[in-house]
């Protein structure tokens, strides 16, 4: 068993032993601990780029020295890294990195990853500065990219070897760098960029926050922040911030400038998500000396709507299940049939329509099935499974045999006939009353007209009898 495997085993035993006596969260205290990671060192292929790597890799270890972590009691018997790999035939290259001048917010996730059943991938490569005055023999820079599986964090760190390392007696034969008495390459983390989540899923129309933070040593200046989107071979700028000026290329994209200086937070907010927002986002932070980035995958989802209808009422009726407004494309449609007193059974023979895509980018499809009602009828269910649904979504309808449909039709027609007769009867009952009221109204109108005519005749007579 190697040193790294033994160290992880001891840590897991310590964590399991302290599980039953885990204190209240309020009682947790900060403690400095060494975080040891199994890595690979990408051999220098002569590429002068920010991240130089090749297919050839060598075994390596990364020891983050005395990282502050919250201790819940499980680190009581924890032992820091002691080295001791020089006696091996093929010892890994050990990088000791101090974190005195930067913050590692997700150190706990790195420390407990093995015991939590998560995998940590770590790759170290040379980092080349585009500047003069650096001495390769005594100064070197490395980039360490660390990722935790299962939705864990991802962190990229720029590490620098100290200038006084030239006084060391031991030298690494391939790196041509001085080694400590323990046989390690001593470095210091001067800049790091991290994200808490490497992949996110949001519903269509909602808002998304893409996490991106950084930490740097005093003396470095923040130059720019850039968010870019890569999707289906195309790249585009989403948001940029340079020396105090922010510009949103994607409508509504926001980044809080005050958070850059105070909290070292470069997170991006995207409101009213559309299908076009899906893809790989790159958060790139540039300082006066270093540049690093994080990659975040944003997935857009839209839940389907399911509607089941009866297309015809033939001897063997056809059922149509409409699935509309879903994204992404993959969807599973199953049909089940259940007779009275029986259990649901999956049926085959369904056909599908051509795929349809809306202007918004969502998909729709229809599934048709010829139903067999049987002698007592049956209930058919169209069930849809999609990544946006926590559980399958279904719609059901009951299909009855032809004789029952005929009987039901007769009952329905008879009911309509009886209702019509009842309505006519009520109309006839109300007819005499309405006729009487109408005649009374006519008599009243005639009487008033006769009275007015009489008065008019008297007035005319009076006018004629007056002397001139």
UniProtKB/Swiss-Prot annotation:
* InterPro entries for the chain: Ig-like_dom, Ig-like_dom_sf, Ig-like_fold, Ig/MHC_CS, Ig_C1-set, Ig_sub, Ig_V-set, Immune_Resp_Modulators
Query: Which residues belong to any copy of the Ig-like V-type domain?
Result: 181-297
Which keywords does this chain's UniProt record carry? Cell membrane, Disulfide bond, Endoplasmic reticulum, Glycoprotein, Golgi apparatus, Immunity, Immunoglobulin domain, Membrane, Microsome, Repeat, Signal, Transmembrane, Transmembrane helix
As given in the record, the signal peptide range reads: 1-18
- Give the disulfide map: 212-283, 321-382
Q: How does it sit in the membrane?
A: Single-pass type I membrane protein
Transmembrane residue ranges: 406-426
Q: Which stretches of this protein does UniProt put in the Cytoplasmic compartment? A: 427-468
Places the protein is found: Cell membrane; Endoplasmic reticulum membrane; Microsome membrane; Golgi apparatus membrane
Pfam families documented for this protein: C1-set, V-set
Chief subcellular location:
membrane
One GO cellular component term, please give it: plasma membrane
Attached carbohydrates are found at 265
- Where, in residue ranges, is this chain on the Lumenal side? 19-405
> What this chain does, per the record?
Component of the antigen processing and presentation pathway, which binds to MHC class I coupled with beta2-microglobulin/B2M. Association between TAPBPR and MHC class I occurs in the absence of a functional peptide-loading complex (PLC). Expression seems to slow down and down-regulate MHC class I surface expression.
Question: How does this protein assemble?
Answer: Interacts with peptide-free HLA-A*02-B2M complexes or those loaded with low affinity peptides, likely facilitating peptide exchange onto higher affinity peptides. Interacts with MR1 in a ligand-independent way; this interaction may stabilize MR1 pool and facilitate ligand loading and dissociation.
What is this protein's name?
A: Tapasin-related protein
